[in-house]
Curated annotation (Swiss-Prot):
Protein name per UniProt: Cytochrome P450 4F2
Record flagged with keyword Heme: yes
Enzyme class of the recorded protein, top EC level: oxidoreductase
The organism of origin for this protein: Homo sapiens (Human)
Source organism superkingdom: Eukaryota
Amino acid sequence: MSQLSLSWLGLWPVAASPWLLLLLVGASWLLAHVLAWTYAFYDNCRRLRCFPQPPRRNWFWGHQGMVNPTEEGMRVLTQLVATYPQGFKVWMGPISPLLSLCHPDIIRSVINASAAIAPKDKFFYSFLEPWLGDGLLLSAGDKWSRHRRMLTPAFHFNILKPYMKIFNESVNIMHAKWQLLASEGSACLDMFEHISLMTLDSLQKCVFSFDSHCQEKPSEYIAAILELSALVSKRHHEILLHIDFLYYLTPDGQRFRRACRLVHDFTDAVIQERRRTLPSQGVDDFLQAKAKSKTLDFIDVLLLSKDEDGKKLSDEDIRAEADTFMFEGHDTTASGLSWVLYHLAKHPEYQERCRQEVQELLKDREPKEIEWDDLAHLPFLTMCMKESLRLHPPVPVISRHVTQDIVLPDGRVIPKGIICLISVFGTHHNPAVWPDPEVYDPFRFDPENIKERSPLAFIPFSAGPRNCIGQTFAMAEMKVVLALTLLRFRVLPDHTEPRRKPELVLRAEGGLWLRVEPLS
């Protein structure tokens, strides 16, 4: 009877073959997922209609190639921001919508959302994972929250103050090179090249208490970090190589793996050596020895950190955080310093005023070094730095993946699952936020002029719960380098105007070349 019923229903052949039944279940599962995805896609499209979009290049590619990582692309972005000052929708292919946000009122809802609601988008950061691991830059959820709480003491003023001596020493080494190169009166130098080495030199001393003399001779470790940064930037623009399997078959992929191994081996060796030292001395003796040298480096802080339950970081976690700090701390600071020197070269009247401010501060002091308490007494230099960071933010865009609907102040809704690009560059160049946004005007940051401005109008270090944990470190280093550079050198523009090139940080095509003249 059961056979007759199955036959009458047309299911007897299926019941007779478990493989056909399995195929039917699989096809049903696939169809259900396709239908669910299709419904979600069309629902998102409907809800995103309230966001304006520029004309697509074509139906398949969408807006891909409209804003290229070139000077021309930056100009297109500037025009888009002027046309759509609240932000706009773009399509990366036929089925991938993104929202580009460039106004403080709109950004606020996303950037101030918790790390669970608006985590960093993995697509834009995933290529860094084999190098940086699950550190603060790439981690999410409870792990990110725990590590953020544990690492915050590493950037307390009392930890940062002793680093001032390191900053002074590293910039002195760079300036000694410049004096030799400019022995005949002046020298034309690529600021990115020289300042990147200087920031890496400082970071190695602050993170590992290790002096590689990388500004004076080649260093394998430093060369590996520079190579990794270049390879990650290059991979972003090669769509097929986004697939890991294909990438690691290429010469670039193999170079990336070798450089990762070298960097990881160096960090692991320092951690293991420090772990051997710590038990033999005990925590109290270890801290007393460090107090005599007046410097507690980043590895020390990580090794001693405990969470609320008394748990420490694993060696893998410490390596990830140290490698992340080395990556995030060198390129961003080098970019910020290079562009502010460019602006001061273009505006000699501001350069001279900064120089006089530094000379007045250090007039009765030998040696001429910048100390922690000096940082608050360089107001005009700080204004010049901030205006440069506005025009040329080191990190031009931040991505967030929205995990639940976010309601904007004007009532529009960003649907769950959408990637939001918080355009730092766009916000800083938005004429609805900044009058004459392309003009370099340090007085925008005069204390009287910032009172009525949204705090999210200026976000070079991001904002909200996932803002840059190292921004005080970065600003301190930048002030030391800029003050001593202007004290010793006159900076002049090169004959060719730099062309902006956004990669992992905002660079200049072929380097950012300026002429330096020793003042004495």
